[in-house]
């Protein structure tokens, strides 16, 4: 019975993003990716969502065959070409392949990628294909070696999004924040997901020279249109730190958004800015009322009698309330759930860390309040400057309320972990999730600019999406 519970623990585990992502590189000439047919010179500003992170990592090419023995994945998939911005660029350029180094507008990261890309194991757990501070991640932290992480080191990217950056950091950050230090392993605290990601800055921006901000890089490209999607990490860093990180003031969020838009406008670019989803609806956050049913179901599946499983789950819920302040309005993260199940497997009391394992009711309420205020600030900045607003918040909220996206009902796609919208980290979208977001941007831009850019074929993307149920 214990073995069966352990087997489930592996299945339930999800992870922290590597604490070693970073940047660095040597200078290079500005080689601009040729457009195929489009006359639009589009640049992407943002964080990991615009960069195309999936399953804790950033990578520009597949790893084949899969180096993890017995993994159900025949290969480890590249992440960057599947991002929403890469798909948007492709649709603007007659379907050109954003993964082709000869023409790609992306700062393609060479395998095994930056971060710790998650891969399923034969036993049903998760592992990664790179160590947290292996040579690839370590190279990313030094300007002289950062471009060694790239497949296309001589190409100046048009997607200048830096994973982990906040709205304010896009205006001012010019260096990695910390040296490469070993983070938790593939099954660890989710606080590692966003705190080190901005250390990707040098591999992405090194072509522009030293001490360059993301905004400065975008302006240097002389865009006609710039997409801006920032603010997600302001929320994640607050929620996943147990509230220890001082939250960004909403007024500052609005001022920074306005500054970014106005500087891009002054450089001759139209701006398309997106607001933020309700962060706690991401699959990595399990609402407290769902904890008992999940644990009960998994323990029954592992072989425990139904009455014992239900009583055990009730005890877990009681401990969450009394010890951690996680009541009906709180959340347990996927990493926290993994720890709970691991403790149950060896008949021990579980211990959770405030940074990354759970979100108490009070912190959840504060996070949602900030979420609302940030969206109001971003919306006001767009209105004051005439920027086009992509209402990602409304799209996701409506889809969650509807039970998901009707791509292949009932299998895909919902917003729960493993439901098809998210990749294995429960924070960054799957191929299908990114494709739906690309279409939201395309449709908004077509309406705003009276253009006819075709939508991405989401059904075709879904058909080969390794992260979506079939």
Q: What spans do the regions from the language model cover?
A:
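Bacterial Sec-dependent N-terminal signal peptides
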Residues: 17-40, 452-470
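Catalytic nucleophile-elbow at a beta strand-turn-alpha helix junction centered on a G-D-S/GDSL motif
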Residues: 40-58
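A short helix->loop->beta-strand "cap" motif at the edges of active sites that frequently abuts
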Residues: 266-270
């Amino acid at each position: 019975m214990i073995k069966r519970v352990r087997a489930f623990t592996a299945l339930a585990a999800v992870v922290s993003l590597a604490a070693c992502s970073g940047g660095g590189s040597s200078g290079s000439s500005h080689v601009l990716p040729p457009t195929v047919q489009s006359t639009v010179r589009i640049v992407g500003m943002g964080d990991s969502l615009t960069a195309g992170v999936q399953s804790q990592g950033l990578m520009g090419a597949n790893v084949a065959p899969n180096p993890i023995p017995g993994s159900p994945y025949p290969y480890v998939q590249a992440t960057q070409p599947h991002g929403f911005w890469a798909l948007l660029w492709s649709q603007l350029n007659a379907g050109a392949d954003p993964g082709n180094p000869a023409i790609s507008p992306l700062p393609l990261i060479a395998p095994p990628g930056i971060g710790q890309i998650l891969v399923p194991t034969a036993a049903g757990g998760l592992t990664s294909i790179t160590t947290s501070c292996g040579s690839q991640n370590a190279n990313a932290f030094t300007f002289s070696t950062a471009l060694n992480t790239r497949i296309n080191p001589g190409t100046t990217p048009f997607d200048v999004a830096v994973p982990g950056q906040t709205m304010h950091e896009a205006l001012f950050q010019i260096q990695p924040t910390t040296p490469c230090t070993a983070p938790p392993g593939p099954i660890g605290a989710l606080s590692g997901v966003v705190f080190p990601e901005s250390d990707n800055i040098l591999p992405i921006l090194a072509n522009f020279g030293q001490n360059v901000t993301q905004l400065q890089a975008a302006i240097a490209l002389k865009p006609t249109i710039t997409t801006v999607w920032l603010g997600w990490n302001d929320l994640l860093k607050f929620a996943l730190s147990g509230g220890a990180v001082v939250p960004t003031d909403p007024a500052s969020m609005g001022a920074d958004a306005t500054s970014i838009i106005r500087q891009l406008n002054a450089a001759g670019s139209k701006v398309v800015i997106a607001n933020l989803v309700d962060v706690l609806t991401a699959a990595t956050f399990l609402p407290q009322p769902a904890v008992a049913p999940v644990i009960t179901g998994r323990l029954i599946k592992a072989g425990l009698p139904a009455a014992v499983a239900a009583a055990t789950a009730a005890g877990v819920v009681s401990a969450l309330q009394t010890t951690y302040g996680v009541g009906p309005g709180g959340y347990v993260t996927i990493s926290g759930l993994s720890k709970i199940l691991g403790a149950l497997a060896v008949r021990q009391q579980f211990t959770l860390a405030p940074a990354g394992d759970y979100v108490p009711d009070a912190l959840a309420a504060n996070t949602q309040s900030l979420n609302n205020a940030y969206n109001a600030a971003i919306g006001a900045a767009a209105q004051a400057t005439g920027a086009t607003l992509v209402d990602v918040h409304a799209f996701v909220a409506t889809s969650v309320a509807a039970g998901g996206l009707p791509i292949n009902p009932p299998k895909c796609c919902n917003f729960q972990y493993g439901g098809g919208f998210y990749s294995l980290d429960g924070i960054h979208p799957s191929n299908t999730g990114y494709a739906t977001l690309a279409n939201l941007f395309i449709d908004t831009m077509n309406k705003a600019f009276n253009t006819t850019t075709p939508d991405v074929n989401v059904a075709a993307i879904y058909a080969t999406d390794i992260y979506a149920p079939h």
